[in-house]
C-alpha cells in the first residue's frame, strides 16, 4: 500500500472531529465501579480468541489490546503508523516489505519480541489457513535477517498489504504457544481461551457465561494503562444493561437497542458516542442467477428507485445512519462524492419496469435473524416495492442456511451488511464486483461486467493511490448506473457509556474495539 509516505489526514478523521458528538447530561462520576477498573457489558459470551482463527470483531475487543502489531491504526485515522516496527522499506518492485523492529518490547511472560516471533506468527497463521489467512493470500514467505529485521516477500503487488498488518490477525504471537500444541493444532486449543501477546493487557480469567477479565501486562513497553483491570461482563438483557449503566454499575453498555439511545443519552451521568462508521447495509440484487427479470438493468434501477431510504434509516436505525452514494462509504478514500444517488421515486420505478417489458413481477427476499433490524427492514422493502408494482415474498431462514443460499446464488434479493477488514477501497470494489468472486467470496449480486473487472483489477495491482482512485471512480459510475446492488445506508457507530470515561477514540477499522491502554476515568 504505502511505504513511510507523508501522513495524510483521512476524510473520516475530519468527520470524526466535525460530525461526532456526545448526547449527554453531565453529572458527578458514580463511584460504584472502582476508578481503576473498567466494566463493559456485552450481550453474549465470546467463543474463540486465537488471532489466527477469528474474524469476529466481538472477539477482537479482547485480543486487540492483548497483542501488538508491526503497524497500528493512527488513533481515529485509517492510516497506519509504526507499532512494533520502528520503520519499514518497500522494494522497488513492491514485492518485499522489510521491517526494523523496536527494541524493548516483551511478551506477557517477559520473552523479548523479536523477528523470529514475527515469522512464527505469520507462518502459523498461513498453516492454520482459517479466515484471517485469506487476507494474506499474496504473502509468499517471511524471512529473518537478524533479531530486529524481518522481511515479507509477496507473490504479487498488494497495495493493501501494509494495512492488513494493522488488523487483529496481525497480532504478534509468543512462540511459546508452540509448546501448547495438542495433536498438531499449533496451539489453537490453548489460544482459544488464552492470550499470548505483548499488548497492554493480558487475559487472566474467563468464567463462561459471566465475564472475562483483563489485567495490565507487567512487561508492556508502551504507555502504562490507567486501568489495572478491565472486565467484560455478560449481561444478556438490554433493559438490565440500561439500568446498570444508569446506576453506574457498569461503565459501557454494548447491548442497548438503537431506538432507545436518544433517551439513554438524556440519562444523568451517561453519554452516547455517535460517530460515522464504515459499516453499510445493502441489498443483494441477484443479477445473473435469480429471477430472469433481474438481469435487466432497468428492473434493478426500478428497485433502487422504489426503496424508501429515509424510511429505512428512520425505522431500522432510529435515524442514526446516512444514505449511501455508491458502494464506497464516506470516510474511505477512493470514493466518488459525486456519483449518482438514487432517490425514492415510485413513478420512475414503474416507468422503468414498463420500458423493460416487465409486469406482475414477483421476487423473493432472503434474510435471517442475524441482525435484529432485518425483520423490520424486510417488511419495509416489501412495502416499498409493492408501491412500484413489485410483489416481494419474504423468505426468513437461519443464518447458516442463508449463507449457503447466498453462496450458491439461490435467491432473488437478500439483505446484507458489510464492513472492511482493512482500510482500502478494494474491500468494497473488488470484493463486491469482481466476476471471479461470486457468492460468499464477496460478489453477492453475481454481477459481471468485463469493463468493471478490468478497472478494479488494475486498481488492485498498482500502488499509485491517485491512479487507483481514478480507476475506482470510473468503476463506481458503471456499477451505480447498472444498480448492481441496492445501496441503502451507512451506519453510525453508537456506544453508551458513563460520562466520566475519558480518552475513548473510535477508529472505523476497529469497530467494537477499545483503546484500553489510553482510556481513563475522570
Where are the model-predicted features located?
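Alpha-helical secondary-structure segments
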Residues: 39, 114-121, 147-153, 199-200, ...
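Aromatic- and charge-enriched surface segment that lines or borders ligand/interaction sites
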Residues: 86-131, 145, 151-153, 244, ...
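Gly/Pro-rich hinge or "lid" segments in bacterial periplasmic/extracellular proteins
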Residues: 74-75, 167-225, 229, 346-347, ...
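Ligand-site clamp/hinge motif
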Residues: 217-263, 391
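Detector for C-terminal structural segments
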Residues: 207, 306-334, 369, 373-382, ...
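N-terminal lobe/hinge region of extracytoplasmic solute-binding protein
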Residues: 41-92, 123, 196-198
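Structural transition elements
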Residues: 201, 322-355, 372-373
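Surface-exposed binding/hinge segments that line
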Residues: 100, 134-180
